[in-house]
Amino acid sequence: ILECVFSCDIKKEGKPCKPKGEKKCTGGWRCKIKLCLKI
């Protein structure tokens, strides 16, 4: 599980890659330089 370096507010497919208040990305997303990437 990869942690987000930056808080990711960008939403893709209607879902945030990092839910507010969470420290890690969920749902197969990870944050990279404030971009949501599906892994």
From Swiss-Prot:
Q: Print the keywords alphabetically.
A: Calcium channel impairing toxin, Disulfide bond, Ion channel impairing toxin, Neurotoxin, Secreted, Toxin, Voltage-gated calcium channel impairing toxin
Q: List the disulfide bonds.
A: C4-C25, C8-C31, C17-C36
The UniProt entry, under InterPro entries, shows: Hwtx-2-like (IPR012625)
Q: In which tissues is it expressed?
A: Expressed by the venom gland.
- MF term (GO), any: toxin activity
Q: Does the keyword section mention Disulfide bond? A: yes
Does Magnesium show up as a keyword for this record?
A: no
Q: What is its main location?
A: secreted
The cellular location(s) given in this protein's UniProt record come to: Secreted
A GO cellular component annotated for this chain's UniProt record is: extracellular region
Q: What biological function has been recorded for the protein in this entry?
A: Inhibits voltage-gated calcium channels (Cav) in rat cerebellar granule cells. Has insecticidal activity to crickets (Acheta domesticus). Is not toxic to mice.
Record family assignment: Belongs to the neurotoxin 12 (Hwtx-2) family. 06 (TXP1) subfamily.
> What is the name attached to this protein's record?
Omega-theraphotoxin-Ba1a
